[in-house]
Structure formats: C-alpha cells, structure tokens
C-alpha cells in the first residue's frame, strides 16, 4: 500500500505593492522649500533611487530650484554618465552612477531623457553640467547640428551648428573651448578642425597646415599635456597645441592607440 500523499496547497506570490508609509507621508507633507533644502544636502548619487519614491520627489529632483539651492550651499557635484548607442535603435540609452542602498556599492542606473538626440558617430564632450552632442550621422548623412544635454534637469537644448558637416570626428575641451577635428567629407587645411567658444557661442575654423597627412576620420583622441592628440582609422597620429598654435605629426604607433575607456562626467 502506497503511503498517503499529502496535498500541498499551492503557494501563490504576487509582486509587492509599494504604498506610502507614515514616515514617507510625513516627509511629503513638509513645505516644498524645506524639502528642497533637505534634498540639496543629499548626494546626487542617491537621486535615481529617490526619484522612485513618488512623482513629487521626481519633480523636485529635476527642478531648477533644487540646483540653485545646491549651488548656494556649495553642494554642486559631478556625476558619471554612460551613453549607449545601438545601431538598430535610433534612440540612445543613457545611464548614470547610482548608490546602491543594500548592499553598499554603486551601479549604473538607467535614466529617462525625453526627446534624446541620436549619437551615432557624433562627438560627445562634457563641459560643466552640460554634455555636448556634436555632429554625427543622421539617416546616413553627415550633420553639423549641435545639441546640449543639461545633466541637472535631463533636458535638451540646441546650440549653433558647426561650420562643416561631420561624421566620425573627435571633440575635446581646452580652456573653455571645444575643438572638433576630422569627419568632414572633403578634408583640407581650412576645414579639418574648428573651434567653438562657449562664452560667445561662435564657431571658427582652425587652420591645419598638415591636413593632407591627417586621416579624415578620427578613431581616438585625448588631451595630453595641453595638446590634443588624435588618431585616425589608418593609425596616423597628429597633435595640436592650441595655446601656441602648433601642429605636430606623432607617428603611427603611440600609447594613445593601445586602448582607452571613454567616460563622461557632468
């Protein structure tokens, strides 16, 4: 005779529904000015988590008043941003560094940025709390457009277009100016590089007397010892020091070409 089999009750589980606790309700009932003063003293690394508390918190975290208060309190803070461009998707994915509540540590958290601009083959560079998205490929066409992501509010605004349409170029910052090199359809000494003055919001060409020996497309670049070092897809390297307006060929093999990790801090 077989042993009796006990009927097991099927245990069902459901996703927990987050409801406001008395403590969180009390916090949300505080005056807006006081909430902003409190949030201004919290690290930006905690903002992605706090934005999940409620729509009110999400709105406060993206408000101009909060960042004005942080500035007055001397609590301005830079954060790490990651942008992923997927060839099959027109819209890029944006992430920012977030502190993990449990266990300790950090994680890249996805952030929602409405009306995000395409970043395929564009030049991304951070200046203060802004990330400039310069040129690139839009429907397989070179572009001269420039847009700016304000990392405080995660909103976009337009900036003056470049003088030349560019694709697969490089962008670097020195002394408050953005230098954009390569990527034009027809490279010559007068259009291989141009510079954007952030204060005056104007573009000007930078004459490159050795443009004929430079690659049209740029693969890697970095600012090293006051000079912009650029490497094309053919491995040809060139360095430009804007402070003394000096160009120099740096050969086909250089430690810059051995591999780099790209980060944006804004």
Curated annotation (Swiss-Prot):
InterPro entries: F-box-like_dom_sf, F-box/kelch-repeat_ARATH, F-box_dom, Kelch-typ_b-propeller, Kelch_1
Pfam families: F-box, Kelch_FKB95
Keyword check for GTP-binding: no
Keywords: Kelch repeat, Repeat
Ranges of the Kelch repeats in the UniProt entry: 130-176, 178-223, 226-266
F-box domain sequence ranges: 24-70
Recorded superkingdom: Eukaryota
Name of protein: F-box/kelch-repeat protein At4g39560
């Amino acid at each position: 005779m077989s042993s009796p089999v006990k009927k097991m009750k099927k245990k069902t589980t459901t996703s927990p529904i987050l409801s406001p606790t008395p403590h969180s309700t009390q916090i949300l009932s505080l005056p807006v000015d006081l909430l902003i003063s409190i949030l201004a003293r919290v690290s930006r690394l905690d903002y992605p988590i706090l934005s999940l508390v409620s729509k009110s918190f999400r709105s406060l975290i993206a408000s101009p008043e909060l960042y004005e208060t942080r500035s007055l309190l001397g609590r301005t803070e830079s954060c790490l941003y990651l942008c992923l461009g997927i060839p099959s998707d027109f819209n890029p994915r944006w992430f920012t560094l977030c502190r993990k509540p449990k266990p300790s540590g950090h994680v890249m958290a996805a952030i929602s940025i409405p009306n995000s601009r395409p970043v395929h083959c564009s030049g991304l560079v951070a200046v203060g709390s802004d990330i400039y998205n310069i040129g690139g490929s839009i429907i397989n066409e070179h572009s001269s457009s420039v847009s700016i992501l304000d990392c405080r509010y995660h909103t976009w605004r337009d900036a003056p277009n470049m003088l030349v349409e560019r694709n697969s170029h490089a962008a670097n910052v020195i002394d408050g100016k953005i230098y954009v090199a390569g990527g034009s359809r027809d490279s010559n000494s007068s259009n291989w590089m141009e510079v954007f003055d952030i204060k005056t919001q104007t573009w000007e060409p930078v004459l490159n007397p050795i443009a004929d020996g430079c690659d049209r497309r740029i693969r890697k670049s970095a600012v090293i010892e006051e000079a912009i070092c650029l490497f094309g897809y053919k491995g040809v390297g060139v360095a430009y020091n804007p402070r003394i307006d000096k160009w120099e060929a740096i050969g086909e093999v250089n430690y810059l070409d051995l591999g780099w990790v790209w980060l944006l801090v804004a």
